[in-house]
Amino acid sequence: MDFDFDPEKARLNPINHDGVTFEEASAVLLDPYALTRIDADTTDESRYITLGMGGASRILVVVWTERIERIRIISAWKANQPQRRIYEAQF
């Protein structure tokens, strides 16, 4: 799986979202227990929201889209308590 992202968004994301990097976020999309849903709030492209385990062993939320055989990460942040409960309820 190939990942892509806007370099400026990648630079700002850790500053705005508790140190979460797009590199860490990419691990969420490889998590076999990740939960994904369609982001119904966007109309210009198909976007997805995935809840899963990141590369630093913390549960993250990742917004992403598919673009020409690549996964483009748009944003990522630490899951809040209700989101963590949803993810952990699988086990």
Features from the language model and the residues they span:
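Ribonuclease/tRNase effector modules and their secretory precursors
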Residues: 1-91
